[in-house]
Amino acid sequence: IYSHFGVADICYVCIGALIPIAVTGGFHIDGFMDTMDAFHSYKPREEKLAILKDSHIGAFAVIMLAAYGLLFMGAFSQIINDKAFIVFCAGFFISRCLSGIAVVSFKSAKSDGLLFMFADTAHRTIVRAALYIQLALCMAVLFIVSLPYAVAMIIAAALSFWYYYVKTKKELGGITGDTAGYFVCICECAMAVALGGVSFII
């Protein structure tokens, strides 16, 4: 579509990468940066949790955000097929469904904070079931749109979800509000890479 209107590739990539940030106000990016600072501090668990509360930006947050941006934009530049783009857009819904599932399923690293409050008061079974149903319906539609792209993206999302569980449990003993944003970012980037790879191959 973008090529039909004569939009340059670099413009397509930059605007495409900016839209999710503009829509959310960079809320998830903030969590990603805080989490990167904590993970790359290589300090004891308690100090990592303290770093998550620190409003200052560390060097590793900036470095990893730059790396993330380059990887995401590079992958997005390969998504030039209309069906791949449709599947890519659905990825934002999938990442948030999985993030919600994690909130009501994974252990919280702290006994305070917004995430703990939400998880503690939520009707876990009902919320989890609702999210799984929405996720299943979304995947069913994607299978109809394009089986190869849908399979690639779902595998990437599942691997991201598994990595998120293992990494946060090892580093922090559970998840926090910041790591929820971190997960959304890595999940969306992984899905973009998967779709970009499949687009390049086929």
Per-region residue spans from a language model:
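Membrane-embedded alpha-helical segments that form the functional core of polytopic membrane enzymes
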Residues: 1-33, 86-91, 149-170
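Acidic (Asp/Glu-rich) catalytic motifs at the cytosolic membrane interface
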Residues: 19-57, 165-187
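Membrane-water interface of transmembrane alpha-helices
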Residues: 26-36, 98-109
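Multi-pass membrane catalytic core of lipid/isoprenoid biosynthesis enzymes
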Residues: 38-83, 87-88, 126-142, 184-202
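Function-critical hydrophobic alpha-helical transmembrane segments in multi-pass membrane proteins
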Residues: 87-102
